[in-house]
Amino acid sequence: MRYDFSTIEKKWQSFWLKNNSFSSGESTDKPKYYVLDMFPYPSGSGLHVGHLEGYTATDIVARYKRSCGYNVLHPMGWDAFGLPAEQFAIKTGTHPKNTTEKNISSFRETLQAMGFSYDWSREINTTSPDYFRWTQWIFIKLYELGLAYVSEVDINWCEELKTVLANEEVEEKVKEGYTVIRKPLRQWVLKITAYAERLLDDLDELDWPENVKQMQRNWIGRSEGMEIDFELRCHNRKLRVYTTRPDTLFGATFLVISPEHPLALKLATAQQLVAVTQYIKEAKLKSELERTGLQKDKTGIFTGSFAINPATGDPLPVWISDFVLTSYGTGAIMSVPAHDSRDWEFAKKFGLPIIEVIKSPDGVDDAAFEGKESVSINSSNPEISIDGLHFSEAFQIMAHWLETKGLGERKVTYKLRDWIFSRQRYWGEPIPVKHYEDGSIRTESNLPLQLPEVEAYQPSETGESPLATMHDWLYGADEFGSFRRETNTMPQWAGSCWYYLRFIDPENNAQLIDPAKEKYWMNVDLYIGGAEHAVLHLLYARFWHKVLYDLGVVSSREPFKKLFNQGMILGEDNEKMSKSRGNVIPADQVLKDYGADAVRLYEMFLGPLEQVKPWNTNGIEGISRFLGKVWRLVYPDSENPDQRDQAAVLDENPLPEILQRRMHKTIKKVTEDTDHLKFNTAISEMMVFVNELQKNGCRQKSAVENLLLMLAPYAPHITAELWQAIGHTSPISAEPFPVFDPAIAEDPVVTIAVQVNGKLRGRFTAPAKSPEESLVDMAKHVDTVIKFLEGQTIVKEIVIQDKLVNFAVKQSIPNH
């Protein structure tokens, strides 16, 4: 029989769907394993080969864990609200719902063509009313807890998209060429800052990549410092600043406040008022990214006012600059240019004093010295001296002095800011609240609150969403009076904050999730997706999960036990795939040309899963040849028209000892590598085994069966077909993974390297697991080693079991 991958793959995909082969049961007598992909946004451009990498990895794990006796939950769904569908609707007039459904159908078809073993009975769609009613329910709970509130805030406004962007979204949109400005707007805000400490502390218990955890730590930005009061000269009031370095107070030579600070205009003298007003106006048009970029040229304006340094009594000019943000600390800083690079640049530009108060190895004329390892200098007055003290001690003494004098207090602050949750768009979850004429707000009692049909999808020039034009939907009355519904919708992140829970109980109309099912399936054991979501989806989902934990809806503090970030697959030109570069490789095309098993194996064989690697079509052709070798183990005459439909009669006799050992070594290696997501080396080991079988003309049934069982999670279609061809009636997907015998898997004889002072001097063979003293003795008698030990004193003997003996020697001193 010829290896016709197209026919074979369709056959088994149809079989799996028809028989619900990968349905997750609720049997609690099995250990559970929940493996999850970051579910996709169904875009109109479809899936390319880079998208398939993470999905292939999770599918290998899901199939492998099932074969190891686990009850596996491996679901798929669609994160389908979002800007692209709405922008397409604006251009074409097509309802986003229709576009989304079409795109989902295309995505589903591709994923099924890859043979992914999803439990399709659990499929979810964030735009389905049955789903977003519970997203709205969570919002109501947030509101009832005081974690959702309305505020007039300066927001990041995108002119082209006519919508608000969260702080976390700005950088991406600016890179895409959009204009982002700051302007005040009434917004719904979620109080994520109330969970800042827990979000930070609980990172330590997660099995996540350290770089992702560090990105979240940096984004949350916990800092311990002090708020210090500076007397304002001629104003009879104080200006409070936040600093993490009270030990540098003696070096403060000016203060800087944000353009939005409530004292900004009040501190402007008559001579400076016009210039200050103009500066504030211009600063408010800039995005935070523009204002805080380290490379940007520093700008500022002197208010004309002065404050008094509480440590020195010196007058300090008060400036306004856009690099200071109201949202961090107090919106005012003390500037110590000798020991802060931004302050140094500012001082140099505007000719302000620079006073060294931490001993710097190279001085501070050419750059600020920001280290904490040196000691304080020039830091004393008649009441206190911290000269000669290192940072930690100087901090404590200075803080105590300021607190005793009533000049300041210790504070813990966070860079993290509350999450702006409103979007002035149509295609998002309606926010389920009503605004009454008396100013009160009430939540919707009948969920889901659905989107009305609209005639136009464009956001209004006033900043309101298209919902503001739908009067029949917008206005109403009930027992509490006349009301106006909220016209903002939720951001695209809302539905993905809790989707992993809905997969557990997707048909439940009575509650968000059944407690018994939640307790059985949570946490997610393995979550695979891109590192680009470190401070967006992953942080938001952790926040919502902690709220649900406090409400008693979930039983764990964290949603995702282990996170793994797959590396990107680049185009053949070694660049990131994109339409603009013209280097996108559509998934459907390679599936048609090479088949799902070849694509799956090739993407996993490219290199370590976490690494970035380029696509190479020549490589996938090599994988196709490997699959042909596997096929010919069962159909050796597949190229012979007269005999190609005849499967080989496999030999029931035991394997020769050398192949038996090779088989068990292969099972051991593939098991260990699959457990550790080292798929490329597992595939390599199976290739070596196939070559050994071919070279030895092996037709033993046990060898072929064990090969197919090992390969099944990686290449499920060809293995299912060959398993059936050699006489099995039950599908291979229901079979257990092969188990190796440790005694057989170990080599009976091993080669040991001998080093003298780290240099290779010889080798010898020895029985595996030989005692250390035996290995040392044998190593001393290796012919090529003896001469390097003569006249030497052995200082140390280092033995690595079954691998190495190293002698550390020094020349013997003769006795006279």
Curated annotation (Swiss-Prot):
UniProt catalytic activity: tRNA(Leu) + L-leucine + ATP = L-leucyl-tRNA(Leu) + AMP + diphosphate
Pfam families: Anticodon_1, tRNA-synt_1, tRNA-synt_1_2, tRNA-synt_1g
Ranges spanned by the short sequence motif 'KMSKS' region, renumbered to the chain: 576-580
UniProt-recorded Gene Ontology molecular function terms: aminoacyl-tRNA deacylase activity; ATP binding; leucine-tRNA ligase activity
TM region positions: none
Compartment(s) where it occurs, according to its Swiss-Prot or TrEMBL record: Cytoplasm
CDD domains listed in its UniProt record: Anticodon_Ia_Leu_BEm, LeuRS_core
Keyword Aminoacyl-tRNA synthetase on entry: yes
Residues reported to bind ATP: K579
Group of enzyme by EC: ligase
GO terms for cellular component: cytosol
EC number per UniProt: 6.1.1.4
Annotated GO biological process: leucyl-tRNA aminoacylation
InterPro entries: aa-tRNA-synth_Ia, Leu-tRNA-ligase, Leu_tRNA-synth_edit, M/V/L/I-tRNA-synth_anticd-bd, Methionyl/Leucyl_tRNA_Synth, Rossmann-like_a/b/a_fold, tRNAsynth_Ia_anticodon-bd, Val/Leu/Ile-tRNA-synth_edit
Keyword Cytoplasm (UniProt): yes
Family: Belongs to the class-I aminoacyl-tRNA synthetase family.
Protein name: Leucine--tRNA ligase
Native source organism of the sequence: Chlorobium phaeobacteroides (strain DSM 266 / SMG 266 / 2430)
Gene field: leuS
